[in-house]
């Protein structure tokens, strides 16, 4: 599941939706806007190609790791300090595969940010 939205997300709701009898681990990551010198927040452009890029990241993770499901939610627009930016959740029968997949997904998304993230000064 890949979603780009303006509104916030619920980590608990996403994780609850990933539970199933064969799943033994659900790993979640929530990225937030951190303070930076003179910063008011970050602006993420709502780009059409972003959805496709995130879907490709999801697809690669499913193919590479022994996982059951992936959820990626990325917010767009202006996000102030401490606001949620990104949710990545991965479910698997074993924790190692879930941790490894989650880390891989986060690293790939971080590379995407270089093209559609802009710092906003106070």
Which role fits each region the language model picked out?
Residues 1-84, 92-122:
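N-terminal, polar/charged subdomain of small-to-medium soluble alpha/beta proteins
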Residues 88:
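Phosphate/diphosphate ligand-binding glycine-rich loop within oxidoreductases
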């Amino acid at each position: 599941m890949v979603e780009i939205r303006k509104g916030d997300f619920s980590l608990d709701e996403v994780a609850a939706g990933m539970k199933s009898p064969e799943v033994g681990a659900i790993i979640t990551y929530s990225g937030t806007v951190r303070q930076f010198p003179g910063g008011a927040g970050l602006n993420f452009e709502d780009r059409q190609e972003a959805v496709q890029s995130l879907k490709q990241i999801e697809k690669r993770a499913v193919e590479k790791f022994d996982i059951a499901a992936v959820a990626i939610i990325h917010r767009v627009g202006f996000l102030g300090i401490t606001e949620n930016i990104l949710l990545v959740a991965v479910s698997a029968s074993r924790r190692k595969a879930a941790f490894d997949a989650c880390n891989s997904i986060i690293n790939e998304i971080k590379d995407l940010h270089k093209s559609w993230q802009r710092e906003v000064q106070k």
